[in-house]
Swiss-Prot record:
It comes from Bacillus subtilis (strain 168). Belongs to the peptidase C56 family. It is an enzyme of class 3 (hydrolase). Residues 3-171 form the PfpI endopeptidase domain. This is General stress protein 18.
Amino acid sequence: MGKKIAVVLTYYFEDSEYTEPAKAFKEAGHELTVIEKEKGKTVKGKQGTAEVTVDASIDDVNSSDFDALLIPGGFSPDQLRADDRFVQFTKAFMTDKKPVFAICHGPQLLINAKALDGRKATGYTSIRVDMENAGADVVDKEVVVCQDQLVTSRTPDDIPAFNRESLALLEK
């Protein structure tokens, strides 16, 4: 049975950190809903290779509508974490112990949600100190799975491992 996966995304996301996991999730039979501030608008990746149409506004969704959350990296998470609606949406997944998949700069939303304390995680080099300051035990590995809930990776190079572990967690 396919799972419903929320994807929080805005302008200048890292293209492959959305497109490759999205493809893997869809091929495995899961349904993705791209969430941003405004339904129907198109957001572009920072590399210029991906354009995504927003399926739903953050104002029209609830974490209870979904089984898991994907947070692609790039500049998108830094913009979204300035909006408390996205922070609270992210926090709800962690509080409810639903799977959360965050790659590269994706953990920035988890930092603002105060959801990393006591957890093993990884992320892009430039945010690792921020993650540590948020209480995370930061590990420099291609993928880190914590408590059968949180999957994190560092960069686009880690996408195959990120996808593998994310899909495995969805099967549990």
